[in-house]
């Protein structure tokens, strides 16, 4: 069984079956199993099991042997490294025997698997080989670079050695110098030791001298103590003797007063005087108990004064409630009761002496008459003249009262107040006789002089009788002395009243009913505490003049030693935060300089007084006089507004400072105000003169300047000079023995007083009388000093003419120029400068006139000091140039070259006072920005100079001045962007500039390099966003208003390099010097930013030059590199050639950077460019390579420009397949002229770029389209859509030096108009179906940007229209209209010989385009636009083109194409005839007839004019002048023109009204010519100058109005061609109507609104409104 099994076939698959089947058959034949016993069966089973095991062993052995034989035979040639054997080995060892399956039963499949595996391995090895080759190339390149670096290293090492040698030499030199310096140091140390030894000796000597000096001081102190003791004893004895003397003098004075009083009363009774004496002596003695006197020696120098009317305790209460506190004078002057009110009408404040607080009752201080009301015609006797009774209509010598103010029944004393800021204001008690002298209109000079003499003697008597002005007030004031004073004053009042009676006119009127008598019951309302509000304001007092001061400090700031209290009062009066207050309410001060005719308005309402007798207070509205004009003390209480800190002179009453008007003024009646001519400086007539009724001819003789305070002048001459009384002064000057140069105790002469008060006539009289012109007072001030300080120009001019010393310096060093600058009077400054005064004189405090001018903030005075040249200087400024208005601050800053050269040197500008402050310190600390500007404009100013506290001008400056100083020293460097040198001059427009200014950088001293870097980056970012934004945003607003997608892709990273002048710099780089010092040292005039361009393989400079966004250019570059064949096409002027060239340059430099050479070949294609020339070009440029030749590594870029001139199918048709398959397998066979042919194929590295100036392809050229990559540059899409806007905006920024103007500027409007013209023009051409006439933005890039000259843009537009736009439109329309019209002649012949219909369509289209696209929206005014209309071609549409369709309706009415046009079922007839004018057919959309808003006469006239013109036109238009359109293309153009006019998306052409370019509707009736209301002479052609289109806004409004109003009034027919559908239906209506009517009107149908084509509205309706 084993043998049978072993002898079976070696097929292992069938072996088990055969081995099992053979023993089974033998067993069936030999024995039967069923017959076997159990043991046999067991034995048989064991035998079979053994056989099976042996068989399995044999099978496994055979399998192993077979495998080895197979492997050895089939795969013996493979080694152990074979991957298949490894696979088999791994497979056999990987799993068990039972799990193993044969890899493949078929050896072929095993072989195929091995081969596939081998292929994969081969591919992998090839890739690894290629990678190894690339690595080898890189390694070689790195070796080359390493060699170059080694060479550089060698050169650097050599340089380093040279530098080491140089440094070694330098070190040796430094060592030598150090040795020399060390020797010098040793010598200097020895000298220092010697100096120290000498210093010790000097110190010892100084200590000995100090000991001796201390001993001397002790001895002198002892002697002073002894002298003080003796002086105190002498003072005690002197006071006792003085008290005794005063008592005796008072007693004597009382007796004399009683005697004089009795004498005068006797004389009055003898003369028949009806009036009673004012007050008897017993009454005076009876009322003496109400006088309370308190004497204080150490109290403050203020006096509390009050007025009262009733006698009793209640009056005393009023005195306590209503005090008037004023600073007291240093000493007393006039008597207490020397000046009573007029007729006892008002109580005046008594004199308040230093240390005396006195409250006087009305009875003791005022002499009053019995309390009886006088009869109506009785005149009241007053001290200095009569006063008419109160009445509203009675003339009086008071200031004008406004009509709305009730005249109060009170009067103030007639004296002008005078204030002395250098000392405390005085209490006004003394009635000035000079002041009241001018109140009498009929007063003769002789009587006036007598009155002055009498009152002057009375004042002298007062001074002689116990009121010595030079002595201090007595400590022992007895009642007897006061009684004597009262008696003496009563006597003097009686005499004055008696004298006034004979010198006064008789006038009277009954008093106002209900008002208390002025003479007895009325009192002044109490005046509250007054204080200074501003430095230029003084204290407000009553109307009385001050008492005579004992010792005025004159022009000095420091008081005299005998009066120690004055210094305290002086300091208290200098408060700068106080103001004049009247009745506890501040009065607003007018400006410091009151011009002629100004009105000073006082407060309307003031607090009412607690006194029951006071009437309501009126609001005063006075016309006050300017400088030099005195104002009556009845009307005003003048206070000079001298600054508190002003050294020296005290202002007079007639100062040019503001006048403070008290409200407690008594007015008798209103008078006429003073004219402005009577209030000029130095004029003789004044407000008082005019008010008093003097004759103008007497004014110069009687008075000059008005009343002024006497100010304590002891002589009549000084009084007359101070008062300005020319008559009295001339009388006194004629007397013999009078000393005209006599000066009072303070050194003031008559000339000084007249000059100080501004009395020019008095000054002239005194100078003619040979008064001393340079006489100085105790403080060293001369008359010219006083006049200059007060601003009296005429007086200064007179004094200078009489050779006054204009350079005289006072005790403190003040010159007239200094005082004029301190006052801020520019006229005086100019006059003194022209006289040649010295500008460099300094005061004791080190102040110069420049300091004074700056301290007061006088800009004009400072300009004069710095720039005004004296006439003697030769080349000084002329009169006009030196005027203050010429040198303006802003103008000087904008035009530095126009600034005049300063006259004063830098030393004077930088001069420091005692505290170390320069004029710039003062201006900066006070915030006078304009003064600081003028000082900074001086080239020699040193703002870094420090004062004694080590502070600079910037340290003490206010915020505004600090900002000014920082910006003034800042360097304004322009920042410019450069795009580098552009290659290919013919590729881009000429408007592509290489540099553009974007802004100006302000570089200050503290600016760091980090700040500078941030400023440059921010400026670039802001500029890029500004030019790419949609609106005219400012550079500060672009970050907020500019959207992110509007950016053109440029940023700070697009910068290649930055140069500061000529020095290269990069952002973030720092130098040792600050940017301010660095730029000044290198004289950098600009900062230039260079953008990376094609030379660097970037397109940033191309983006900035062309304004095409950077992402778009990068996308174009990607297309060229990817597809190798790209064509750029778009309308003419879309920058196709420029884009292609810049992309080629960028690719060339990119390839050069990698190491490959690249050439650019440009070819300009024209109509004669043949395919053979193109082949030669390809072969020469190595783009076409012979089939047997291997390609080179060089790359080539071919640019074919202007492909639209040739046929693409003919030129490139044979190259399409080779261009797509660039290999030797797809060659191109080129047949030469000699019959030979060669095969070529295109190089893989050849790039073909073409440009076509055509919007779309047509005809056979479409076959070429699918073989190229096309880039369309549409005018209504990016990048062309926003290119023009961005380009023009950048042009405006460059023109305005980096600043964007506001949207309302004319430049912005003209730029927006040019942009809209380009867009509207292309939109209209698109509607016309003429894409070949579309324009790119290139020709609009030359739009001029001329600020202030909008006409230049219109002229440029007219030239562009005539040279470019109009010819293109004409050619496009003719070419379209002649396609089917003249097929035999072609388009060229049709353009040369157009038919009349074509001419009509062309001119109609030009007129429509001109009005709709160009003139529409022009920002020029109507008049200028009318003048510019004649420059545009095609603006006038001639009348000879008007005709009708019916002339050829029979011949061409059956045209099939035209019939197609006329059979539109959606449109109905829009025209039929109406027999009348008054029944318009209104549309369903609500168009209503509106009446014309003008008179009926104008409407009737226009209607009649229209009818006449229509009749004339019907006679003028003959059949020969009509034409018809017979071409279908022409009709289609007409329809497109009509649809364009009625397009709602565009501006409606029907709204372009009032033009003479009529586009006429072709009427359907031959016998009814179309009338036109706009033709003035139908037999003459319409000239182009008559064309007058409106602006867009006016056009829309006017057209909307006339479109609705004409429907019912007048009908203007449109004469443009209409479709055939209208002609047919209109002709049917014509047959039904009479053909002989020439005045029929056409109405609009309800359903024909869209068919209206009226290019212009009726003009005569609007003409009456013009």
Curated annotation (Swiss-Prot):
| Gene3D superfamilies recorded | Ankyrin repeat-containing domain (1.25.40.20)
Identify the keywords attached in UniProt to this record, alphabetized: ANK repeat, Cell projection, Coiled coil, Cytoplasm, Methylation, Phosphoprotein, Repeat, Synapse
InterPro entries attached here? Answer: Ankyrin_rpt, Ankyrin_rpt-contain_sf, Cortactin-Actin_Reg, Cortactin-binding_p2_N
Basic and acidic residues bias locations: 1545-1566, 1648-1666
Q: Which residues form a coiled coil?
A: 120-274
- Tell me the ranges holding the ANK repeats: 712-742, 746-775, 779-808, 812-841, 845-874, 915-945
Q: Where is the composition biased (Polar residues)?
A: 469-481, 1585-1594
Principal location: cytoplasm
Query: What's a GO cellular component annotated to this UniProt protein?
Result: actin cytoskeleton
Asymmetric dimethylarginine PTM positions read 501
- Molecular function (Gene Ontology), one example: protein phosphatase 2A binding
Q: SUPFAM superfamilies from the xrefs? A: Ankyrin repeat
Short name of one Pfam family for this protein?
AAA_lid_NAV1
Subcellular location per UniProt equals: Cytoplasm, Cell cortex; Cell projection, Dendritic spine
Q: Which residues carry this modification: Phosphoserine?
A: 1527
Question: Locations of Low complexity compositional bias?
Answer: 385-398, 457-468, 1627-1641
Q: Where is this region: Disordered?
A: 1-25, 202-224, 366-411, 457-481, 501-619, 1545-1601, 1620-1666
PANTHER family, sorted: CTTNBP2 N-TERMINAL-LIKE PROTEIN, FILAMIN/GPBP-INTERACTING PROTEIN
Q: What quaternary structure, including any partners, is listed in this protein's UniProt entry?
A: Interacts with CTTN/cortactin SH3 domain. Interacts with STRN, STRN4/zinedin and MOB4/phocein; this interactions mediate the association with the STRIPAK core complex and may regulate dendritic spine distribution of the STRIPAK complex in hippocampal neurons. Activation of glutamate receptors weakens the interaction with STRN and STRN4.
Q: What does this protein do?
A: Regulates the dendritic spine distribution of CTTN/cortactin in hippocampal neurons, and thus controls dendritic spinogenesis and dendritic spine maintenance. Associates with the striatin-interacting phosphatase and kinase (STRIPAK) core complex to regulate dendritic spine distribution of the STRIPAK complex in hippocampal neurons.
Name the record gives this protein: Cortactin-binding protein 2
Source organism per entry reads Echinops telfairi (Lesser hedgehog tenrec)
């Amino acid at each position: 069984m084993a043998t049978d099994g072993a002898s079976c076939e070696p097929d292992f698959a069938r072996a088990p079956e055969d081995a099992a089947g053979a023993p089974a058959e033998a067993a069936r034949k030999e024995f039967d199993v069923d017959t076997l016993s159990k043991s046999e069966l067991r034995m048989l089973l064991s035998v079979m099991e053994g056989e099976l095991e042996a068989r399995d062993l044999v099978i496994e052995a055979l399998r192993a042997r077979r495998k080895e034989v197979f492997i050895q035979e089939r795969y013996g040639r493979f080694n152990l490294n074979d991957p298949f054997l490894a696979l088999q080995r791994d497979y056999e060892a990987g799993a068990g025997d039972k799990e193993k399956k044969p890899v493949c039963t078929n050896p072929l499949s095993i072989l195929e698997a091995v081969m596939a595996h081998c292929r994969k391995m081969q591919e992998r090895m090839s890739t690894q080989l290629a990678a190894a080759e690339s690595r080898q190339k890189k390694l070689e390149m790195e070796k080359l670079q390493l060699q170059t670096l080694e060479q550089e290293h060698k050169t650097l090492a050599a340089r380093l050695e040279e530098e080491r040698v140089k440094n070694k030499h330098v070190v040796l030199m430094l060592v030598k110098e150090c040795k020399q310096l060390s020797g010098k140091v040793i010598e200097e140390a020895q000298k220092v030791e010697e100096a120290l030894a000498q210093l010790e000796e000097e110190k010892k000597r100084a200590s000995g001298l100090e000991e001796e000096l201390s001993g001397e001081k002790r001895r002198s102190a002892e002697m002073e103590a002894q002298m003080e003791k003796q002086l105190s004893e002498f003072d005690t004895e002197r006071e006792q003797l003085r008290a005794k003397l005063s008592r005796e003098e008072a007693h004597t004075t009382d007796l004399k007063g009683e005697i004089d009083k009795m004498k005068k009363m006797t004389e009055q009774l003898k003369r028949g005087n009806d009036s009673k004496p004012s007050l008897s002596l017993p009454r005076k003695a009876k009322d003496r108990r109400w006088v309370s006197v308190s004497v204080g020696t150490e109290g403050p120098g203020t006096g509390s004064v009050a007025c009262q009317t009733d006698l009793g305790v209640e009056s005393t209460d009023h005195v306590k409630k209503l005090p008037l506190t004023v600073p007291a004078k240093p000493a007393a002057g006039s008597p207490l009761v020397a000046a009573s009110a007029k007729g006892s009408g008002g109580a005046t404040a008594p004199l308040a002496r230093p240390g005396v607080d006195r409250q006087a009752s009305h009875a003791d201080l005022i002499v009053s008459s019995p309390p009886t009301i006088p009869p109506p015609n009785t005149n009241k006797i007053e001290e200095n003249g009569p006063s008419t009774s109160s009445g509203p209509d009675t003339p009086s010598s008071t200031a004008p009262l406004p009509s709305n103010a009730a005249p109060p029944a009170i009067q103030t004393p007639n004296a002008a107040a005078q204030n002395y800021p250098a000392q405390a204001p005085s209490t006004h008690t003394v009635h000035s006789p000079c002041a009241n002298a001018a109140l009498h209109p009929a007063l003769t000079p002789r009587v006036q002089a007598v009155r002055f003499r009498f009152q002057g003697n009375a004042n002298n008597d007062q001074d002689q009788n116990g009121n010595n002005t030079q002595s201090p007030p007595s400590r022992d004031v007895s009642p007897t002395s006061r009684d004597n004073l009262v008696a003496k004053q009563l006597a003097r009042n009686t005499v004055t009243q008696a004298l006034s009676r004979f010198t006064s006119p008789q006038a009277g009127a009954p008093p106002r009913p209900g008002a208390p008598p002025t003479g007895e019951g009325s009192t002044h309302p109490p005046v509250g505490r007054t204080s200074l509000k501003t430095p230029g304001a003084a204290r407000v007092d009553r109307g009385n003049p001050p008492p005579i001061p004992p010792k005025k400090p004159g022009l000095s700031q420091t008081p005299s030693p005998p009066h120690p209290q004055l210094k305290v009062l002086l300091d208290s009066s200098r408060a700068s935060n106080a103001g004049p207050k009247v009745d506890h309410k501040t009065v607003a001060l007018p400006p410091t300089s009151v011009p002629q005719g100004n009105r000073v308005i006082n407060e309307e309402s003031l607090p009412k007084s607690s006194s029951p007798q006071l009437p309501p207070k009126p609001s005063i509205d006075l016309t006050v006089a300017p400088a030099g004009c005195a104002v009556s003390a009845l009307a005003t209480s003048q206070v000079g507004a001298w600054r508190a800190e002003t050294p020296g002179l005290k202002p007079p009453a007639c100062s040019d400072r503001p006048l403070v008007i008290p409200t407690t003024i008594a007015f008798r009646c209103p008078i006429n105000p003073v004219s402005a001519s009577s209030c000029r400086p130095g004029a003789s007539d004044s407000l008082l003169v005019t008010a008093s009724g003097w004759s103008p001819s007497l004014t110069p003789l009687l008075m000059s300047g008005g009343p002024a305070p006497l100010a304590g002048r002891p002589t009549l001459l000084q009084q007359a000079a101070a008062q300005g009384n020319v008559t009295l002064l001339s009388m006194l000057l004629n007397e013999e023995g009078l000393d005209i140069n006599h000066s009072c105790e303070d050194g003031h002469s008559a000339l000084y007083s007249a000059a100080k008060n501004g009395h020019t006539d008095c000054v002239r009289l005194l100078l003619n009388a040979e008064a001393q012109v340079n006489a100085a007072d105790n403080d060293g001030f001369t008359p010219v000093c006083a006049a200059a300080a007060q601003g009296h120009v005429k007086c200064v001019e007179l004094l200078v003419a009489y050779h006054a010393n204009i350079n005289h310096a006072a005790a403190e060093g003040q010159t007239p120029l200094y005082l004029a600058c301190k006052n801020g009077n520019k006229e005086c400054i100019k006059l003194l400068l022209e006289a040649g005064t010295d500008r460099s004189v300094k005061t004791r405090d080190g102040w110069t006139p420049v300091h004074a001018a700056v301290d007061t903030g006088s800009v004009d005075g400072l300009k004069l000091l710095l720039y005004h040249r004296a006439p003697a200087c030769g080349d000084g400024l002329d009169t006009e140039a030196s005027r203050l208005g010429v040198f303006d601050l802003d103008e000087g800053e904008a035009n530095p070259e126009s600034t005049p050269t300063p006259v004063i040197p830098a030393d004077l500008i930088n001069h420091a006072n005692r505290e170390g402050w320069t004029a710039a310190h003062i201006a900066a600390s006070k915030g006078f920005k304009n003064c600081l500007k003028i000082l900074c404009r001086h080239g020699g100013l040193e703002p870094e100079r420090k004062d004694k506290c080590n502070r600079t001008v910037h340290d003490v400056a206010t915020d505004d001045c600090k900002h000014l100083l920082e910006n003034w020293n800042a360097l304004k460097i322009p920042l410019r962007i450069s795009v580098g040198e552009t290659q290919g001059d013919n590729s881009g427009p000429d408007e592509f500039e290489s540099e553009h200014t974007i802004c100006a950088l302000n570089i200050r001293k503290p600016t760091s390099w980090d700040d500078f870097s941030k400023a440059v980056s921010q400026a670039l970012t802001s500029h890029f966003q500004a030019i790419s934004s949609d609106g005219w945003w400012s550079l500060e607003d672009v970050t907020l208003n500019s959207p992110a997608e509007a950016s053109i892709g440029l940023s700070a990273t697009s910068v290649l390099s930055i140069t500061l002048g000529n020095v290269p710099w990069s952002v973030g780089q720092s130098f040792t010097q600050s940017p301010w010092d660095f730029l000044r040292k290198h004289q950098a005039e600009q900062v230039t930013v260079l953008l990376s361009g094609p030379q660097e393989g970037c397109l940033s400079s191309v983006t900035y030059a062309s304004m095409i966004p950077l992402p778009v250019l990068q996308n174009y570059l990607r297309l060229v590199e990817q597809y190798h064949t790209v064509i750029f096409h778009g309308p003419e002027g879309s920058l196709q050639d420029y884009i292609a060239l810049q992309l080629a340059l960028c690719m060339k430099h990119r390839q050069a950077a990698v190491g490959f050479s690249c050439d650019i070949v440009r070819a300009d294609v024209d109509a004669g460019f043949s395919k053979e020339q193109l082949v030669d070009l390809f072969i020469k440029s190595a783009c076409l390579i012979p089939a047997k030749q291997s390609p080179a590594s060089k790359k080539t870029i071919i640019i074919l420009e202007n492909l639209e001139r040739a046929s693409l199918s003919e030129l490139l048709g044979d190259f399409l397949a080779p261009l797509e398959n660039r290999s030797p397998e797809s060659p191109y066979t080129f047949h030469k002229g000699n019959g030979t042919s060669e095969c070529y194929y295109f190089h893989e590295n050849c790039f073909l770029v073409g440009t076509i100036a055509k919007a779309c392809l047509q005809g056979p050229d479409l076959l070429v389209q699918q073989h190229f990559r096309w880039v369309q540059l549409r005018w209504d899409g990016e990048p062309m859509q926003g290119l023009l806007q961005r380009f023009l905006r950048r042009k405006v920024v460059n023109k305005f030096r980096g600043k964007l103007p506001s949207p309302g500027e004319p430049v912005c409007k003209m730029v927006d108009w040019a942009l809209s013209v380009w867009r509207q023009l292309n939109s209209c051409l698109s509607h016309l179906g003429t894409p070949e006439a579309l324009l790119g933005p290139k020709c609009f890039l030359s739009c001029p940007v001329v600020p202030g000259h909008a006409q230049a843009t219109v002229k440029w537009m007219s030239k562009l229209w005539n040279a470019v736009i109009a010819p293109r439109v004409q050619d496009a329309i003719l070419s379209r209209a002649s396609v089917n019209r003249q097929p035999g002649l072609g388009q060229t012949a049709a353009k040369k010989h157009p038919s009349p219909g074509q001419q009509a369509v062309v001119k109609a289209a030009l007129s429509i385009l001109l009005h709709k696209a160009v003139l529409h929206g022009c920002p020029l005014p109507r008049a200028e636009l009318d003048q510019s209309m004649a420059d545009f071609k095609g603006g006038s549409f001639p009348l000879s083109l008007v005709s009708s369709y019916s002339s050829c309706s029979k011949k061409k009415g059956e045209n099939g194409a035209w019939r197609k046009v006329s059979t539109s079922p959606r449109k109905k007839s829009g025209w039929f005839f109406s027999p009348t004018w008054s029944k318009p057919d209104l549309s369903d959309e609500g168009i209503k007839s509106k009446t014309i808003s003008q008179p009926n006469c104008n409407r009737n006239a226009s209607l009649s004019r229209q009818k006449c013109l229509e009749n004339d036109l019907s006679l003028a238009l003959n059949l020969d002048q009509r034409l018809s359109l017979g071409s279908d293309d022409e009709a289609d153009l007409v329809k497109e023109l009509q649809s364009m006019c009625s397009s709602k998306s565009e501006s409606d052409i029907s709204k372009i009204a009032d033009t003479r370019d009529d586009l006429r509707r072709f009427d359907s009736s031959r016998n009814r010519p179309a009338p036109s209301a706009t033709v003035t002479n139908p037999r003459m052609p319409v000239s182009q100058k008559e064309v007058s289109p409106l602006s867009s806004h006016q056009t829309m409004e006017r057209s909307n109005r006339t479109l609705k109003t004409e429907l019912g009034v007048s009908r203007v027919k449109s004469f443009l061609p209409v479709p055939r559908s209208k002609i047919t239906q209109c002709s049917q209506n014509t047959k039904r109507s009479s053909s002989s009517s020439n005045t029929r009107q056409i109405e609009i149908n309800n359903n024909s609104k869209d068919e209206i084509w009226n290019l212009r509205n009726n003009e005569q309706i609007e003409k009456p409104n013009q």
